[in-house]
């Protein structure tokens, strides 16, 4: 007996599926390039925590293991004074910037920063079998260490994304008791300026997942360490968050400890054979290592050198939508923490209590860019595609969608500010809201830093040498060029006559 197939039949969509195209398909590049550079960018603060007085931060936290997310603001090229007015037609075209060159300059000497905790949860030194902790109520000790070494640079026209493990939600049908291991949840969020990088203890929310505040050093025990979500940014269909990235990481395990406290999930009896006498109790099996970034060398530096963007990893080939660019930098090879000392008295003899010790960390940056001027022809297909991708781009270009026809008659009062009529709806804000107003970035304004004289700047000269473009001609002096002398014609050689 015949019977129909039980497999599911998939019907294709009635309309063709929209395809994401690269920006090179509708963006025309010109031969006009500009150089832009920031001023010397400096940051000074305490490397472990911020100092507060009267609920006000007087000294910020500035650590060599923080993300530096620069929000670079560019001028509007459609309002730019161009050298040639015939480059584009404002009625049918719009101009955009394309980032083609970048150099992140780093000042300050190379150095290794040290972190630690005055009360670190260290029980046994499992690296050396003869060194063990004494059972007691509090076995925490003062331990210092250096962190994992990271160099990172990410460039895009949208903020980068980071991932970390946080505390998840328990199911309602699962009984929960005090001291149970919390469930984990992978959280993706925007990386902001000042967020901590992965130091070797994992990308996680230490404030929620380590309630004893003593399993990791003090600069991360109350915060969250994030790791760039490369998979999520690579899967971005439009490729705005990550044009390209540079990364270098290295770490090795330096010391090995275990944790004090009751083991929540003890070792099964099938895996061990208990001893006799004083070996009947099983020690803590919660092992942990202290990380180390090892040698810091100038031969393995990613910064202070130019990088040229020919082809991005996504569909956005360096176009700076919204006239902004996000540069995310991590450099732990310059994480030296300076120790400052101030005397309390003027005594001639040394006493520890006569001096106060302080710590500071300083950072120095310099950003240089090469931008290429590009044009977009405003056809119906291109405008529809840009509206689907990012409607705010068309709003910045003074384009909008016509509202549908309204069949109802609206009421408009003569006197709006009057107690005789009902309260009117508040008028909407005319200014465009900032989508990143609740996020923290280091804003770098380059609206007045553009220059077409590329040969006057270090990165511009490197670009001219690399690309083969010629700079502007040099200034001519008043010396008259000597006339070309005509060489006298060589005398013709007479042909010797021969007798026949």
Curated annotation (Swiss-Prot):
- One MF term in GO for this entry? structural molecule activity
The GO cellular component terms are:
host cell nucleus; T=7 icosahedral viral capsid
| Keywords on record | Capsid protein, Disulfide bond, Host nucleus, Host-virus interaction, Late protein, T=7 icosahedral capsid protein, Viral attachment to host cell, Viral penetration into host cytoplasm, Virion, Virus endocytosis by host, Virus entry into host cell
Task: Write down the SUPFAM superfamilies for this protein, in alphabetical order.
Answer: Group I dsDNA viruses
- Origin: domain of life: Viruses
Per the record's keyword annotation, is Disulfide bond included, yes or no? Answer: yes
Where can this protein be found?
Virion; Host nucleus
- Swiss-Prot/TrEMBL GO biological process terms: endocytosis involved in viral entry into host cell; virion attachment to host cell
Which residue stretches does the UniProt record annotate as biased composition, category Basic residues? 491-500
Q: Where is the composition biased (Low complexity)?
A: 480-490
* Region described as Disordered: 475-500
The text of the family note is:
Belongs to the papillomaviridae L1 protein family.
User: Function, please?
Assistant: Forms an icosahedral capsid with a T=7 symmetry and a 50 nm diameter. The capsid is composed of 72 pentamers linked to each other by disulfide bonds and associated with L2 proteins. Binds to heparan sulfate proteoglycans on cell surface of basal layer keratinocytes to provide initial virion attachment. This binding mediates a conformational change in the virus capsid that facilitates efficient infection. The virion enters the host cell via endocytosis. During virus trafficking, L1 protein dissociates from the viral DNA and the genomic DNA is released to the host nucleus.
Q: Write the protein's name.
A: Major capsid protein L1
């Amino acid at each position: 007996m015949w019977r129909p197939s039980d497999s599911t039949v998939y019907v294709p969509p009635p309309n063709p599926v929209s395809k994401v195209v690269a920006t090179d398909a509708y963006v025309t590049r010109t031969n006009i390039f500009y150089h832009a550079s920031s001023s010397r960018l400096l940051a000074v603060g305490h490397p472990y925590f911020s100092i507060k007085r009267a609920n006000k931060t007087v000294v910020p936290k500035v650590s060599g293991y923080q993300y530096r997310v620069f929000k670079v603001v560019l001028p509007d090229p459609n309002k730019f004074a161009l050298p040639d007015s015939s480059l584009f037609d404002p009625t049918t075209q719009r101009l955009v910037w394309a980032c083609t060159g970048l150099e992140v300059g780093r000042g300050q000497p190379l150095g290794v920063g040290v972190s630690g905790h005055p009360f670190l949860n260290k029980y046994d030194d499992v690296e050396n079998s003869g060194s063990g902790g004494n059972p007691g109520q509090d076995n925490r000790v003062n331990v210092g260490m250096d962190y994992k070494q990271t160099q990172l640079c990410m460039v895009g026209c949208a903020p980068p994304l980071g991932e970390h493990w946080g505390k998840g939600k328990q199911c309602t049908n699962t009984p929960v008791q005090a001291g149970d291991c919390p469930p984990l949840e992978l959280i993706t969020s925007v990386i902001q300026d000042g967020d901590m990088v992965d130091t070797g203890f994992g990308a996680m929310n230490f404030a929620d997942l380590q309630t004893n505040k003593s399993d990791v050093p003090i600069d991360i025990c109350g915060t969250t360490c994030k790791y760039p979500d490369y998979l999520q940014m690579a899967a971005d269909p439009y490729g705005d968050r990550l044009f390209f990235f540079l990364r270098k990481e290295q770490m090795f395990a330096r010391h090995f400890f275990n944790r004090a406290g009751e083991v929540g999930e003890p070792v099964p009896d099938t895996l061990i054979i208990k001893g006799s006498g004083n070996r009947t109790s099983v020690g803590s099996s919660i092992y942990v290592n202290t990380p180390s970034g090892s040698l810091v060398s100038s031969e393995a530096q990613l910064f202070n050198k130019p990088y040229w963007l020919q082809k991005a990893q996504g569909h956005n080939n360096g176009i700076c939508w919204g006239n902004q660019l996000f540069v995310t930098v991590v450099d732990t090879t310059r994480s030296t923490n300076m120790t400052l000392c101030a005397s309390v008295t003027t005594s001639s003899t040394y006493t520890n209590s006569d001096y106060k010790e302080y710590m500071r960390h300083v950072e120095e940056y310099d950003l240089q860019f090469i931008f290429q001027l590009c044009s977009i022809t405003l056809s119906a297909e291109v405008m529809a595609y840009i509206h689907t991708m990012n409607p705010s781009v068309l709003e910045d270009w003074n384009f909008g969608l016509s509202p549908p026809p309204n069949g109802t008659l609206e009421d408009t009062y003569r006197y709006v500010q009057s107690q005789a009529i009902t309260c009117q709806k508040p008028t909407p804000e005319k200014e465009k809201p900032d989508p990143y107003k609740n996020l923290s970035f280091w804003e770098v304004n380059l609206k007045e830093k553009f220059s077409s004289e590329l040969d006057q700047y270090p990165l511009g000269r490197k670009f001219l040498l690399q690309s083969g473009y010629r700079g502007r001609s040099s200034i001519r002096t008043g010396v008259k060029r000597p006339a070309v002398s005509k060489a006298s014609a060589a005398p013709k050689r007479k042909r010797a006559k021969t007798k026949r």
